[in-house]
Swiss-Prot record:
UniProt name for this protein: Large ribosomal subunit protein bL20
Organism of this sequence: Synechococcus sp. (strain CC9311)
InterPro entries reported in the protein's UniProt record: Ribosomal_bL20 (IPR005813), RIBOSOMAL_L20_CS (IPR049946), Ribosomal_protein_bL20_C (IPR035566)
Keyword Iron-sulfur: no
One GO term of the biological process aspect: ribosomal large subunit assembly
A GO cellular component entry from the record: ribosome
Superkingdom assignment: Bacteria
HAMAP family: Ribosomal_bL20 (MF_00382)
Similarity comment: Belongs to the bacterial ribosomal protein bL20 family.
PROSITE patterns referenced in this protein's UniProt entry, alphabetically: RIBOSOMAL_L20
Keywords in alphabetical order: Ribonucleoprotein, Ribosomal protein, RNA-binding, rRNA-binding
Length: 115
């Protein structure tokens, strides 16, 4: 069998990792072994946080809606229950945006749920 020299393949593999590690601090961006560990950790964190971001934004929206609802004299749970009962289909993202940008229309939505 012919001898396989891995110069190009190995260099490409290492350079791919080092490209991903560009901007990392200290040896984490220059030495292959530490860069490889940091890149694997970074990719794990990115995967986890793409899922966590959805939860975090939902929590933020709920906190904003709750604050605005309480300013209008109703709790978050009563507001959401009233919206479901009144068959008002506005999602939490839109409600939170409305509460921040246009409090008057948010107050109208709150009044619609209490009627």
């Amino acid at each position: 069998m012919a001898r396989v020299k891995r110069g190009n393949v190995a260099r490409k593999r290492r350079n791919k990792i080092l490209r991903l590690a560009r901007g990392f601090r200290g040896s984490n961006g220059t030495l292959f072994r530490t860069a490889n560990q940091r890149v694997m950790k970074a990719l794990c964190n990115a995967y986890r946080d793409r899922r966590r971001r959805k939860r975090d934004f939902r929590r933020l929206w709920i906190a904003r809606i709750n604050a605005a609802a309480r300013m209008n004299g109703v709790s978050y749970s009563r507001l959401i229950g009233g919206l479901k009962k009144a068959d008002v289909r506005i999602n939490r993202k839109m409600l939170a945006q409305m509460a921040v940008v246009d409090p008057a229309s948010f107050a109208n939505v709150v009044n619609a749920t209490q009627g």
